[in-house]
Amino acid sequence: AIKLIQDSTNRLIRYLQFYRYLYSLASEDSKTSIVEVNRLATDFLKSKNHNIELIFTRLYSIDINDHIAQIIICLIVVASNNLSKNAIIKVELEIQHDKFIGMKIVVIATNLKFDQNKTDILLGTGANSSDHSSITIENVHEYYTYYLITEYGYKLLVTPLIDSVEYTLML
C-alpha cells in the first residue's frame, strides 16, 4: 500500500511539474535547456503508463527560448494522445549557429489514432479565433498549441503516413 501511495505521489508530482511548465507564461528572455525539455517530456510519458520511447536525435547543450520549449512539449503531448500502448516518438531538432530553426516529431506506432478534426485545429483550418464556443475540454490543447505556433511566427505541417505521423515545425 505504501509503494502504491509513493508511486501515485511521484506520478502526480511529475504531472504537476510538467503542466506547470507547459501552461506557464513564457517571457521572451527566459530560456530552458533541451536536456530539461527532454526530462520533462520523458517523465510525462512515463506517467501515462504507456510503453512510449522518446528519442531526441540530438541533445544539444544549448538553451532555447521557453516558448519554443513549450511548443515542443505541446507537440509531444499531441503526439502521445494519438498512441496506443507501444510507440516511438522521435524528436529531431534543427539548430544552426546555436539558434533553433525548426524541428520534426515523428510518431511511429501500430494502431495509430489520427484525429483529423484535431489536426485541422493544429493547422488553423479548424481554428476560429472569434468563435470560442468551439473550444472544448477535448480540443483545448490543440487550440493552445495552434495559438503558440502562430503567436511566435512558426508554421506547422502534419503528414500522416502508414503507422506513423510527422509533425514538422518551421519558421
What are these regions (language model features)?
Residues 153-160:
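Glycine-rich ATP-binding loops of the HATPase_c
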Residues 165-171:
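Short C-terminal beta-strand
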Residues 51-78, 129-134:
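Conserved short strand/loop->alpha-helix "switch" segment adjacent to the catalytic nucleotide/phosphoryl-transfer site
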Residues 2-52:
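Conserved DHp (HisKA) dimerization/phosphotransfer helix of two-component histidine kinases, i.e.
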Residues 55-57, 92, 159:
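Solvent-exposed beta-strand sheet faces enriched in polar/charged residues
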Residues 132-135, 141-144, 148, 156, ...:
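C-terminal transmembrane helix-loop-helix hairpin of multi-pass membrane proteins
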Residues 66-96, 141-151:
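Conserved ATP-binding N-box helix of the HATPase_c
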Residues 99-140:
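Glycine-rich/acidic phosphate-handling loop/turn and adjacent ATP-lid/helix
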